[in-house]
């Protein structure tokens, strides 16, 4: 791989390692991509692999979806892609982007490409919508990228490396910088501030001082970005292998005050008597511990909670957001947070709804927040079978996530206390497993259904059937499965004590 722009040789060892990785990855670049480069060259146009795929090559990662930039117009690009691919489509012609797919051959995966004409966007002050203008140079196109590590390219088919802004040196040094001034870059598109936090999590990059200073000064600008775009960046951050650095960027720069204010609010002041822990740091630790308890991956979904699991991670991060509103200093110097799980569930629902998360995710995270303290009543292992059934029923399909959230919520440094909690939860899981051997716990129902209730009581459909059903469900919770005759008699006894209204 040749280079058209030499980079700062420091740190030399890190640069050399990155270059070796890139050579390995780019050597395995899909032959179809190189063929595509030749097709553009034959038509008199430039084509370069740009952005994330180039960055990832230096990190030793491969990308299935490939992004290209070209000197060709969208119309010219479409003609070339129609010949190269098995399918092509208009992604955003007004933005210069055409997509194509070449189907799998000889066992290789499909090759999907997006090709965009060189652009030199201009933004009006205070606007996040660019005036799109097509450019004529690769360097000009790279200058509009968000960060230098994403402003690298490889010309095809020659495999010439292009790095006008020192992105490779920044990647080797582990620093996140912008190709133009950070103020200008974030004013052009404030979402780039969220992307900075996301890359801190995904790539382990630290923010250049100019980038950090600009975010601190411009955090309020994120308000003009749609909630959906903010949500998507937050989701990508949380699904990183280690979200903590990205979350710390959000909080430390003030960006979280705008997009997730409940998180920085957890930095409760620690008084001189240390009467409570820093709930913010506790929550970050719970998140890390929950991630460690995920099972398998989305690619290899083994176990009950394959990671990365967004619902579990959101619940781990936000489970204590009700504490600031419920904090009380009690006599004797203690601090209480009574009912913070209920208050927190409401806050979680409100915030995630505002961020446009889907209803299922909102309900699940709010429910886990509401239930995260339920286990602590089991500390002395005195729950009845009925209480265990209710625990399982209340958690429903979230039970495996609740197991992991509850275990992760123990961050005490007191080893004896931590062991006690762990042993107690082991015992609860054992109790659940034993009950499952004898009865169905996944969806507990009364031993009689609605039709049977009506037949025994000699009544038709109506509210009385529902009341009887709820009574039998309570019996099922309390006593487990019972003989049908016993349940039928219990139903008649209930009907005698609770006659229909008006009789």
Where is each model-derived feature located?
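Catalytic cores of the polymerase beta-like nucleotidyltransferase superfamily
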Residues: 1-503
């Amino acid at each position: 791989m040749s280079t058209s722009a030499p980079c700062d040789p420091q740190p030399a060892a890190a640069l050399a390692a990155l270059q070796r990785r890139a050579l390995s990855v780019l050597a395995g670049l899909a032959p179809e991509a190189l063929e595509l480069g030749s097709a553009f060259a034959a038509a008199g146009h430039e084509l370069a692999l740009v952005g994330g795929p180039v960055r990832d090559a230096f990190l030793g990662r491969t990308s299935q979806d490939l992004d290209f930039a070209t000197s060709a117009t969208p119309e010219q690009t479409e003609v070339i892609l129609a010949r190269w691919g098995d399918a092509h489509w208009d992604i955003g012609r007004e933005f210069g982007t055409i997509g194509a797919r070449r189907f799998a051959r000889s066992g290789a995966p499909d090759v999907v490409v997006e090709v965009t004409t060189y652009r030199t966007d201009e933004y009006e002050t205070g606007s996040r919508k660019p005036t799109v203008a097509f450019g004529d140079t690769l360097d000009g196109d790279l200058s509009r990228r968000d960060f230098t590590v994403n402003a690298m390219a490889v010309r095809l088919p020659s495999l010439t490396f292009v790095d006008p802004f020192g992105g490779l040196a920044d990647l080797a040094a582990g620093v996140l910088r912008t190709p133009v001034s950070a103020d200008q870059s974030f004013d052009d598109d404030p979402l780039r501030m969220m992307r900075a936090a996301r890359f801190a999590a995904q790539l382990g990059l630290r923010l250049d001082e100019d980038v950090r200073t600009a975010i601190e000064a411009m955090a309020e600008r994120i308000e003009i970005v749609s909630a959906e775009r903010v949500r998507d960046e937050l989701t990508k951050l949380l699904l990183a292998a280690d979200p903590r650095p990205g979350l710390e960027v959000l909080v430390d720069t003030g960006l979280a005050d705008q997009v997730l204010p409940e998180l920085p609010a957890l930095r409760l002041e620690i008084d001189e008597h240390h009467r409570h822990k820093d709930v913010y740091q506790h929550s970050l630790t719970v998140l890390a511990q929950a991630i460690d308890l995920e099972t398998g991956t989305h690619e290899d979904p083994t176990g009950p909670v394959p990671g990365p699991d967004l619902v579990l991670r959101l619940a781990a991060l936000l489970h204590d957001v009700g504490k600031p509103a419920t904090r009380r200093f009690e006599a004797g110097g203690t601090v209480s947070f009574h009912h913070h799980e209920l208050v927190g569930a409401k806050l979680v629902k409100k915030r995630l709804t505002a961020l446009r998360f889907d209803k299922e995710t909102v309900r699940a995270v709010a429910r886990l927040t509401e239930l995260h303290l339920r286990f602590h009543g089991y500390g002395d292992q005195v729950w009845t079978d009925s209480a265990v059934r209710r625990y399982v029923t209340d958690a429903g399909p979230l039970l495996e996530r609740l197991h992991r959230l509850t275990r992760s919520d123990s961050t005490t440094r007191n080893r004896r206390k931590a062991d006690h909690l762990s042993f107690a939860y082991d015992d609860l899981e054992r109790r659940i497993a034993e009950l499952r051997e004898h009865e169905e716990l996944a969806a507990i129902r009364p031993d009689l259904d609605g039709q049977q209730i009506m037949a025994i009581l000699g009544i038709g459909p109506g509210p009385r059937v529902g009341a009887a059903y709820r009574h039998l469900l309570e019996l099922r919770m309390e006593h487990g499965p019972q003989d049908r005759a016993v349940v039928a008699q219990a139903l008649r006894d209930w009907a005698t004590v609770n006659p229909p209204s008006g009789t």
